[in-house]
C-alpha cells in the first residue's frame, strides 16, 4: 500500500499544465498582416458596392421628390413602391455582405489557427504537458507552477 501511494505521488508530480494566450501569439504571426490586408480589400469592395447602390437610390429619390408634384397618384404610388423595394434590397445586400465578410474572415483565419494549434500540440508533446489551457478562457486559478507555453509556441512558429 505504501508503494502504491509513493507511486501515485511520483506520478502526480510529473503532471505538467501549461497556459497560453493564443490571441496574443496569433497577432504576432506574419500571416496575420496579409490576412488583414485581404480582409480590408474584400470589405472595401463590399462597401463600394453598397455605396453605389445607395447613390442610385438617392438619385432616384431626388428625381422622385422633384417630380412627385406633377405625377398622378398611381405613378407616385408605383415610384414609392419602387423606392421602398430598392431600400429593402440595399438592407438585404448589407446583411448578406456582412455575413459573407464574417465567413470570409473565418475562411482566412482557419489556416492560421490550424498552424497555431499544430504548434501548441507539438510543444505539448515535446515537453510532456498533460494540458495546455487558453488563458483567455477565464482560468479561475493559476498556480505559480503553471507554465506559460507562449514562448515555446512562438519559438516553434519561428516568431521572435
Which ranges hold each PLM region?
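Bacterial Sec-dependent N-terminal signal peptides
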Residues: 1-16
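Amphipathic, charged alpha-helical segments and their helix-to-coil junctions
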Residues: 12-160
